[in-house]
Protein backbone atom coordinates (compact mmCIF):
# COMPACT_ATOMS: atom_id res chain seq x y z
CA UNK A 1 0.00 0.00 0.00
CA UNK A 2 1.44 3.36 -1.07
CA UNK A 3 1.18 6.46 1.11
CA UNK A 4 0.44 9.77 -0.62
CA UNK A 5 1.46 12.66 1.64
CA UNK A 6 -0.70 15.77 1.20
CA UNK A 7 2.14 18.20 1.76
CA UNK A 8 1.66 21.00 4.26
CA UNK A 9 -1.67 19.66 5.52
CA UNK A 10 -0.49 16.70 7.62
CA UNK A 11 -2.89 14.43 5.74
CA UNK A 12 -2.30 11.06 4.10
CA UNK A 13 -4.17 9.20 1.39
CA UNK A 14 -3.40 5.50 1.00
CA UNK A 15 -3.38 4.01 -2.48
CA UNK A 16 -3.07 0.63 -4.13
CA UNK A 17 -3.78 -0.78 -7.58
CA UNK A 18 -5.35 -4.20 -7.19
CA UNK A 19 -4.50 -7.19 -9.45
CA UNK A 20 -7.87 -6.66 -11.17
CA UNK A 21 -6.79 -3.15 -12.14
CA UNK A 22 -9.05 -1.30 -9.69
CA UNK A 23 -7.40 1.77 -8.15
CA UNK A 24 -8.28 2.15 -4.45
CA UNK A 25 -7.81 5.36 -2.44
CA UNK A 26 -8.38 5.49 1.34
CA UNK A 27 -8.36 8.36 3.85
CA UNK A 28 -8.72 7.87 7.60
CA UNK A 29 -10.24 10.26 10.12
CA UNK A 30 -11.07 8.75 13.49
CA UNK A 31 -12.90 11.96 14.48
CA UNK A 32 -15.40 11.50 11.65
CA UNK A 33 -18.77 10.09 12.70
CA UNK A 34 -19.36 8.37 9.36
CA UNK A 35 -17.75 6.92 6.25
CA UNK A 36 -18.24 7.72 2.57
CA UNK A 37 -17.54 5.22 -0.21
CA UNK A 38 -17.62 5.83 -3.96
CA UNK A 39 -17.08 3.41 -6.84
CA UNK A 40 -16.37 5.44 -9.95
CA UNK A 41 -16.41 4.57 -13.65
CA UNK A 42 -14.42 6.66 -16.12
CA UNK A 43 -17.38 6.70 -18.46
CA UNK A 44 -19.64 9.72 -18.84
CA UNK A 45 -22.14 11.16 -21.27
CA UNK A 46 -19.48 12.45 -23.68
CA UNK A 47 -18.01 8.98 -24.33
CA UNK A 48 -20.45 7.73 -26.96
CA UNK A 49 -18.01 7.30 -29.86
CA UNK A 50 -15.17 4.83 -29.36
CA UNK A 51 -13.03 1.98 -30.68
CA UNK A 52 -11.98 -1.26 -28.98
CA UNK A 53 -8.57 -2.91 -28.96
CA UNK A 54 -8.30 -5.44 -31.78
CA UNK A 55 -11.56 -4.26 -33.35
CA UNK A 56 -11.55 -2.09 -36.49
CA UNK A 57 -15.15 -0.99 -35.98
CA UNK A 58 -15.99 2.55 -34.85
CA UNK A 59 -18.86 2.49 -32.36
CA UNK A 60 -21.28 5.42 -32.12
CA UNK A 61 -24.01 5.07 -29.50
CA UNK A 62 -27.00 7.26 -28.60
CA UNK A 63 -26.47 10.18 -26.24
CA UNK A 64 -27.73 9.48 -22.73
CA UNK A 65 -26.50 5.89 -22.56
CA UNK A 66 -24.19 6.48 -19.55
CA UNK A 67 -27.11 7.83 -17.53
CA UNK A 68 -29.42 5.04 -18.74
CA UNK A 69 -26.88 2.42 -17.62
CA UNK A 70 -26.47 4.09 -14.24
CA UNK A 71 -30.24 3.76 -13.65
CA UNK A 72 -30.39 0.20 -14.94
CA UNK A 73 -27.48 -1.00 -12.83
CA UNK A 74 -29.52 -0.74 -9.60
CA UNK A 75 -31.69 -3.71 -10.63
CA UNK A 76 -30.90 -7.03 -8.93
CA UNK A 77 -31.09 -10.46 -10.55
CA UNK A 78 -33.32 -11.89 -7.83
CA UNK A 79 -35.73 -8.98 -8.16
CA UNK A 80 -35.86 -5.70 -6.34
CA UNK A 81 -33.30 -2.94 -6.24
CA UNK A 82 -29.90 -2.28 -4.70
CA UNK A 83 -31.70 0.20 -2.45
CA UNK A 84 -33.34 -2.77 -0.71
CA UNK A 85 -29.93 -4.15 0.31
CA UNK A 86 -28.72 -0.92 1.83
CA UNK A 87 -31.99 -0.02 3.55
CA UNK A 88 -31.41 -3.01 5.83
CA UNK A 89 -28.07 -1.51 6.85
CA UNK A 90 -29.43 1.99 7.35
CA UNK A 91 -27.14 3.25 4.61
CA UNK A 92 -27.87 6.02 2.12
CA UNK A 93 -26.89 5.15 -1.46
CA UNK A 94 -27.17 6.98 -4.73
CA UNK A 95 -25.43 7.52 -8.05
CA UNK A 96 -24.87 10.27 -10.57
CA UNK A 97 -23.63 10.66 -14.13
CA UNK A 98 -21.63 13.65 -15.32
CA UNK A 99 -20.16 14.53 -18.70
CA UNK A 100 -16.93 12.74 -17.70
CA UNK A 101 -17.78 9.89 -15.32
CA UNK A 102 -20.35 7.86 -13.38
CA UNK A 103 -20.25 7.49 -9.60
CA UNK A 104 -22.00 5.01 -7.32
CA UNK A 105 -21.72 6.10 -3.71
CA UNK A 106 -22.91 5.47 -0.17
CA UNK A 107 -22.64 7.01 3.27
CA UNK A 108 -23.15 5.29 6.60
CA UNK A 109 -22.04 4.90 10.19
CA UNK A 110 -21.98 1.13 10.69
CA UNK A 111 -21.15 -2.12 8.88
CA UNK A 112 -18.51 -0.72 6.54
CA UNK A 113 -17.45 -4.15 5.27
CA UNK A 114 -21.01 -5.20 4.42
CA UNK A 115 -21.58 -1.89 2.65
CA UNK A 116 -18.43 -2.36 0.57
CA UNK A 117 -19.46 -5.92 -0.29
CA UNK A 118 -22.96 -4.88 -1.40
CA UNK A 119 -21.60 -1.96 -3.44
CA UNK A 120 -19.06 -4.11 -5.28
CA UNK A 121 -21.59 -6.91 -5.77
CA UNK A 122 -24.36 -4.86 -7.32
CA UNK A 123 -22.13 -2.74 -9.56
CA UNK A 124 -20.13 -5.76 -10.78
CA UNK A 125 -23.13 -8.11 -11.12
CA UNK A 126 -25.16 -6.65 -13.98
CA UNK A 127 -28.66 -7.85 -14.73
CA UNK A 128 -30.04 -6.57 -18.01
CA UNK A 129 -33.22 -7.86 -19.70
CA UNK A 130 -35.33 -6.33 -22.45
CA UNK A 131 -38.19 -5.97 -19.97
CA UNK A 132 -36.03 -4.09 -17.46
CA UNK A 133 -34.58 -1.89 -20.20
CA UNK A 134 -38.06 -0.97 -21.44
CA UNK A 135 -39.33 -0.35 -17.90
CA UNK A 136 -36.37 1.91 -17.16
CA UNK A 137 -36.83 3.65 -20.52
CA UNK A 138 -40.29 4.79 -19.44
CA UNK A 139 -38.97 6.18 -16.17
CA UNK A 140 -36.10 8.03 -17.87
CA UNK A 141 -38.41 9.44 -20.56
CA UNK A 142 -40.57 10.96 -17.82
CA UNK A 143 -37.45 12.39 -16.17
CA UNK A 144 -36.35 13.87 -19.51
CA UNK A 145 -39.79 15.41 -20.13
CA UNK A 146 -39.68 17.05 -16.71
CA UNK A 147 -36.29 18.49 -17.67
CA UNK A 148 -37.85 20.14 -20.72
CA UNK A 149 -40.04 22.18 -18.35
CA UNK A 150 -37.19 23.04 -15.99
CA UNK A 151 -35.87 26.49 -16.98
CA UNK A 152 -32.54 26.01 -15.20
CA UNK A 153 -31.97 22.75 -17.04
CA UNK A 154 -32.95 24.21 -20.42
CA UNK A 155 -30.78 27.30 -19.85
CA UNK A 156 -27.74 25.23 -18.78
CA UNK A 157 -27.66 23.07 -21.89
CA UNK A 158 -28.56 25.92 -24.22
CA UNK A 159 -25.38 27.70 -23.13
CA UNK A 160 -23.31 24.71 -24.23
CA UNK A 161 -25.28 24.31 -27.48
CA UNK A 162 -24.49 27.92 -28.36
CA UNK A 163 -20.81 27.60 -27.44
CA UNK A 164 -19.68 24.14 -28.60
CA UNK A 165 -19.77 22.71 -32.13
CA UNK A 166 -18.46 19.14 -31.72
CA UNK A 167 -17.77 18.59 -28.02
CA UNK A 168 -20.44 16.25 -26.64
CA UNK A 169 -21.04 18.55 -23.70
CA UNK A 170 -23.45 20.29 -26.04
CA UNK A 171 -25.78 17.28 -25.56
CA UNK A 172 -27.86 16.56 -22.47
CA UNK A 173 -26.42 14.02 -20.05
CA UNK A 174 -29.82 12.30 -20.01
CA UNK A 175 -30.05 12.42 -23.83
CA UNK A 176 -32.93 13.66 -25.98
CA UNK A 177 -36.28 11.87 -26.03
CA UNK A 178 -35.30 10.21 -29.32
CA UNK A 179 -31.92 9.15 -27.88
CA UNK A 180 -33.62 7.47 -24.93
CA UNK A 181 -36.10 5.69 -27.21
CA UNK A 182 -33.25 4.37 -29.38
CA UNK A 183 -31.01 2.91 -26.65
CA UNK A 184 -31.05 -0.89 -26.94
CA UNK A 185 -30.08 -3.69 -24.57
CA UNK A 186 -27.16 -4.47 -26.92
CA UNK A 187 -25.92 -0.88 -26.53
CA UNK A 188 -26.15 -1.21 -22.75
CA UNK A 189 -24.23 -4.49 -22.72
CA UNK A 190 -21.55 -3.11 -25.05
CA UNK A 191 -20.85 -0.16 -22.76
CA UNK A 192 -20.97 -2.20 -19.56
CA UNK A 193 -18.66 -4.95 -20.84
CA UNK A 194 -16.03 -2.52 -22.07
CA UNK A 195 -16.11 0.43 -19.68
CA UNK A 196 -17.33 -1.12 -16.40
CA UNK A 197 -14.04 -2.92 -15.97
CA UNK A 198 -11.79 -2.46 -12.89
CA UNK A 199 -9.04 -1.15 -15.19
CA UNK A 200 -11.33 1.78 -16.00
CA UNK A 201 -12.60 2.37 -12.46
CA UNK A 202 -11.47 3.60 -9.05
CA UNK A 203 -12.79 3.32 -5.51
CA UNK A 204 -12.51 5.96 -2.79
CA UNK A 205 -13.15 5.19 0.90
CA UNK A 206 -13.00 8.07 3.40
CA UNK A 207 -13.93 8.84 6.99
CA UNK A 208 -13.99 6.75 10.15
CA UNK A 209 -12.19 3.73 8.71
CA UNK A 210 -9.10 1.59 9.18
CA UNK A 211 -7.35 1.93 5.81
CA UNK A 212 -5.35 -1.28 6.12
CA UNK A 213 -8.32 -3.47 7.12
CA UNK A 214 -10.59 -1.83 4.53
CA UNK A 215 -8.07 -2.44 1.76
CA UNK A 216 -7.68 -6.10 2.76
CA UNK A 217 -11.44 -6.55 2.63
CA UNK A 218 -11.74 -4.84 -0.77
CA UNK A 219 -8.95 -7.08 -2.10
CA UNK A 220 -10.75 -10.15 -0.78
CA UNK A 221 -14.00 -9.15 -2.44
CA UNK A 222 -12.36 -8.26 -5.76
CA UNK A 223 -10.31 -11.48 -5.80
CA UNK A 224 -13.55 -13.45 -5.63
CA UNK A 225 -14.77 -11.90 -8.89
CA UNK A 226 -13.81 -12.76 -12.46
CA UNK A 227 -13.34 -10.19 -15.20
CA UNK A 228 -12.86 -10.53 -18.93
CA UNK A 229 -9.78 -9.17 -20.65
CA UNK A 230 -9.84 -5.39 -20.78
CA UNK A 231 -10.15 -4.11 -24.36
CA UNK A 232 -8.80 -0.62 -23.66
CA UNK A 233 -11.64 1.37 -25.29
CA UNK A 234 -10.39 4.51 -27.00
CA UNK A 235 -12.84 7.41 -27.10
CA UNK A 236 -12.72 9.23 -30.43
CA UNK A 237 -10.89 12.54 -30.24
CA UNK A 238 -12.47 15.65 -31.69
CA UNK A 239 -11.14 19.01 -32.75
CA UNK A 240 -13.34 21.72 -31.29
CA UNK A 241 -13.26 25.07 -33.16
CA UNK A 242 -12.30 28.13 -31.13
CA UNK A 243 -15.32 30.13 -32.26
CA UNK A 244 -18.72 30.01 -30.57
CA UNK A 245 -21.75 28.57 -32.39
CA UNK A 246 -24.03 31.56 -31.76
CA UNK A 247 -22.98 34.99 -30.58
CA UNK A 248 -26.48 35.82 -29.34
CA UNK A 249 -29.80 34.10 -28.74
CA UNK A 250 -32.96 35.05 -26.88
CA UNK A 251 -35.34 32.29 -25.77
CA UNK A 252 -38.44 31.97 -23.61
CA UNK A 253 -38.82 29.76 -20.54
CA UNK A 254 -40.79 29.11 -17.37
CA UNK A 255 -39.17 31.93 -15.43
CA UNK A 256 -40.56 34.95 -13.63
CA UNK A 257 -37.29 36.89 -13.76
CA UNK A 258 -35.15 36.71 -16.93
CA UNK A 259 -31.86 34.80 -16.93
CA UNK A 260 -28.75 35.97 -18.75
CA UNK A 261 -25.44 34.31 -19.48
CA UNK A 262 -22.30 35.73 -21.02
CA UNK A 263 -20.13 32.81 -22.10
CA UNK A 264 -16.48 33.21 -23.09
CA UNK A 265 -14.69 30.51 -25.09
CA UNK A 266 -10.90 30.71 -24.75
CA UNK A 267 -8.38 28.46 -26.57
CA UNK A 268 -6.41 26.42 -24.00
CA UNK A 269 -3.13 27.49 -25.57
CA UNK A 270 -3.87 30.99 -24.22
CA UNK A 271 -4.15 29.62 -20.66
CA UNK A 272 -2.31 26.26 -20.48
CA UNK A 273 -4.03 23.55 -18.43
CA UNK A 274 -2.14 23.63 -15.15
CA UNK A 275 -3.39 23.45 -11.56
CA UNK A 276 -1.73 26.79 -10.85
CA UNK A 277 -3.48 28.48 -13.76
CA UNK A 278 -6.85 27.04 -12.74
CA UNK A 279 -6.42 28.47 -9.24
CA UNK A 280 -5.25 31.85 -10.53
CA UNK A 281 -8.19 32.09 -12.92
CA UNK A 282 -10.67 31.22 -10.15
CA UNK A 283 -9.09 33.88 -7.95
CA UNK A 284 -9.44 36.50 -10.69
CA UNK A 285 -13.06 35.56 -11.35
CA UNK A 286 -13.90 35.63 -7.62
CA UNK A 287 -12.36 39.08 -7.34
CA UNK A 288 -14.44 40.42 -10.24
CA UNK A 289 -17.71 38.46 -10.02
CA UNK A 290 -17.65 36.60 -6.67
CA UNK A 291 -19.83 36.98 -3.58
CA UNK A 292 -17.75 39.80 -2.09
CA UNK A 293 -16.87 41.53 -5.38
CA UNK A 294 -17.60 45.22 -5.77
CA UNK A 295 -19.24 44.55 -9.15
CA UNK A 296 -21.77 42.04 -7.77
CA UNK A 297 -22.57 44.10 -4.68
CA UNK A 298 -23.05 47.21 -6.81
CA UNK A 299 -25.51 45.42 -9.13
CA UNK A 300 -27.46 44.04 -6.16
CA UNK A 301 -27.56 47.40 -4.34
CA UNK A 302 -28.90 49.06 -7.49
CA UNK A 303 -31.44 46.19 -7.76
CA UNK A 304 -30.21 45.38 -11.26
CA UNK A 305 -29.75 41.68 -10.42
CA UNK A 306 -31.12 39.27 -7.85
CA UNK A 307 -28.15 36.96 -8.31
CA UNK A 308 -24.79 36.86 -10.10
CA UNK A 309 -22.46 33.87 -10.39
CA UNK A 310 -19.63 32.50 -12.48
CA UNK A 311 -18.29 29.09 -13.50
CA UNK A 312 -15.39 27.78 -15.54
CA UNK A 313 -14.96 24.46 -17.33
CA UNK A 314 -12.23 22.89 -19.43
CA UNK A 315 -13.68 21.28 -22.56
CA UNK A 316 -11.46 19.56 -25.12
CA UNK A 317 -9.37 22.36 -26.63
CA UNK A 318 -11.01 25.28 -24.87
CA UNK A 319 -11.70 26.91 -21.54
CA UNK A 320 -15.29 28.04 -21.01
CA UNK A 321 -16.17 30.84 -18.58
CA UNK A 322 -19.82 31.62 -17.80
CA UNK A 323 -21.07 34.76 -16.07
CA UNK A 324 -24.74 34.22 -15.17
CA UNK A 325 -27.35 36.52 -13.66
CA UNK A 326 -31.04 36.76 -12.79
CA UNK A 327 -32.30 40.20 -13.72
CA UNK A 328 -35.32 42.24 -14.78
CA UNK A 329 -33.00 44.27 -16.99
CA UNK A 330 -31.26 41.65 -19.17
CA UNK A 331 -29.95 43.90 -21.93
CA UNK A 332 -28.50 46.42 -19.47
CA UNK A 333 -26.88 43.73 -17.33
CA UNK A 334 -25.34 41.99 -20.36
CA UNK A 335 -23.84 45.33 -21.36
CA UNK A 336 -22.42 45.84 -17.85
CA UNK A 337 -20.95 42.31 -17.75
CA UNK A 338 -19.31 42.86 -21.14
CA UNK A 339 -17.83 46.14 -19.90
CA UNK A 340 -16.54 44.44 -16.77
CA UNK A 341 -14.97 41.62 -18.80
CA UNK A 342 -13.10 44.24 -20.82
CA UNK A 343 -11.82 45.77 -17.59
CA UNK A 344 -10.96 42.78 -15.42
CA UNK A 345 -8.67 43.65 -12.53
CA UNK A 346 -7.36 42.38 -9.23
CA UNK A 347 -5.53 44.32 -6.54
CA UNK A 348 -2.60 42.84 -4.65
CA UNK A 349 -4.53 43.21 -1.39
CA UNK A 350 -7.55 41.31 -2.73
CA UNK A 351 -5.33 38.66 -4.30
CA UNK A 352 -3.57 37.97 -0.99
CA UNK A 353 -6.88 37.95 0.91
CA UNK A 354 -8.45 35.42 -1.46
CA UNK A 355 -5.29 33.33 -1.42
CA UNK A 356 -5.45 33.10 2.39
CA UNK A 357 -9.17 32.26 2.27
CA UNK A 358 -8.55 29.48 -0.27
CA UNK A 359 -5.82 27.94 1.88
CA UNK A 360 -8.14 28.04 4.90
CA UNK A 361 -10.87 26.30 2.87
CA UNK A 362 -8.35 23.65 1.86
CA UNK A 363 -7.58 22.93 5.52
CA UNK A 364 -11.27 22.80 6.52
CA UNK A 365 -12.02 20.42 3.64
CA UNK A 366 -10.36 17.64 5.64
CA UNK A 367 -13.05 17.90 8.33
CA UNK A 368 -15.62 16.27 6.04
CA UNK A 369 -15.36 12.68 4.73
CA UNK A 370 -17.73 13.37 1.83
CA UNK A 371 -15.81 16.50 0.78
CA UNK A 372 -12.50 14.63 0.85
CA UNK A 373 -14.03 11.82 -1.21
CA UNK A 374 -15.37 14.29 -3.78
CA UNK A 375 -12.03 16.10 -3.89
CA UNK A 376 -10.15 12.87 -4.64
CA UNK A 377 -12.67 12.07 -7.38
CA UNK A 378 -12.16 15.54 -8.88
CA UNK A 379 -8.37 15.14 -8.88
CA UNK A 380 -8.53 11.74 -10.59
CA UNK A 381 -11.03 12.86 -13.25
CA UNK A 382 -10.18 16.49 -13.89
CA UNK A 383 -6.52 17.13 -13.03
CA UNK A 384 -4.12 17.22 -15.95
CA UNK A 385 -2.27 14.09 -14.78
CA UNK A 386 -5.40 12.32 -13.45
CA UNK A 387 -3.91 11.73 -10.03
CA UNK A 388 -4.14 13.20 -6.53
CA UNK A 389 -2.61 16.69 -6.41
CA UNK A 390 -0.44 16.07 -3.35
CA UNK A 391 1.33 19.44 -3.49
CA UNK A 392 -1.84 21.55 -3.68
CA UNK A 393 -0.94 23.51 -0.50
CA UNK A 394 2.51 24.31 -1.91
CA UNK A 395 0.91 25.49 -5.16
CA UNK A 396 -1.33 27.89 -3.22
CA UNK A 397 1.54 29.08 -1.01
CA UNK A 398 3.71 29.89 -4.02
CA UNK A 399 1.11 31.80 -6.03
CA UNK A 400 2.19 35.36 -6.77
CA UNK A 401 0.33 38.51 -7.65
CA UNK A 402 2.59 38.94 -10.69
CA UNK A 403 1.44 35.54 -12.02
CA UNK A 404 -2.18 36.60 -11.61
CA UNK A 405 -1.53 39.81 -13.55
CA UNK A 406 0.22 37.87 -16.32
CA UNK A 407 -2.66 35.39 -16.62
CA UNK A 408 -5.13 38.28 -16.61
CA UNK A 409 -3.46 39.66 -19.73
CA UNK A 410 -3.96 36.30 -21.52
CA UNK A 411 -7.74 36.15 -21.07
CA UNK A 412 -9.00 36.39 -24.63
CA UNK A 413 -12.46 37.89 -25.21
CA UNK A 414 -12.67 37.29 -28.96
CA UNK A 415 -15.34 34.58 -28.72
CA UNK A 416 -18.40 35.44 -26.63
CA UNK A 417 -21.88 33.93 -26.70
CA UNK A 418 -24.78 35.71 -24.98
CA UNK A 419 -27.95 33.89 -23.97
CA UNK A 420 -31.08 35.52 -22.55
CA UNK A 421 -34.12 33.61 -21.28
CA UNK A 422 -37.24 35.73 -20.83
CA UNK A 423 -40.61 34.70 -19.33
CA UNK A 424 -43.03 33.04 -21.72
CA UNK A 425 -45.58 35.42 -23.17
CA UNK A 426 -49.02 34.90 -21.68
Task: Report residues per predicted region.
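His/Glu-rich zincin catalytic helix
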Residues: 1-81, 192-298, 416-426
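Short secondary-structure capping/junction motifs at helix and strand boundaries
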Residues: 126-135, 150
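Short, low-order "capping/linker" segments at domain edges
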Residues: 145-150, 244-256, 360-376, 380
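M16 family metallopeptidases and their MPP-like homologs
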Residues: 27, 34-48, 81-122, 156-178, ...
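A common structural junction motif
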Residues: 121-130, 221-229, 339-348
Amino acid sequence: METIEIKGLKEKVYYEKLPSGLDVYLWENEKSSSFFVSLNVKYGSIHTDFKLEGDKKNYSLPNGIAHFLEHLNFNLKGGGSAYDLFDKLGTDINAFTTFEYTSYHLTGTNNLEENIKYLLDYVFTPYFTKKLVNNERGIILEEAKMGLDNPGNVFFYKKYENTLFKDKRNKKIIGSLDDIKNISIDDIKLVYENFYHPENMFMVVTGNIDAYKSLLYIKEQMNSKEFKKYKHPQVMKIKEPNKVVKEFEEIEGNVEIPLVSVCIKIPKKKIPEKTKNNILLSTILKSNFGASSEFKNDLIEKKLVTNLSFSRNIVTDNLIINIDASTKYPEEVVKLIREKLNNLEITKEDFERKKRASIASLVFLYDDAEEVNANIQDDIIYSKDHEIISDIKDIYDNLTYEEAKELLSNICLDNISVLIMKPKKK
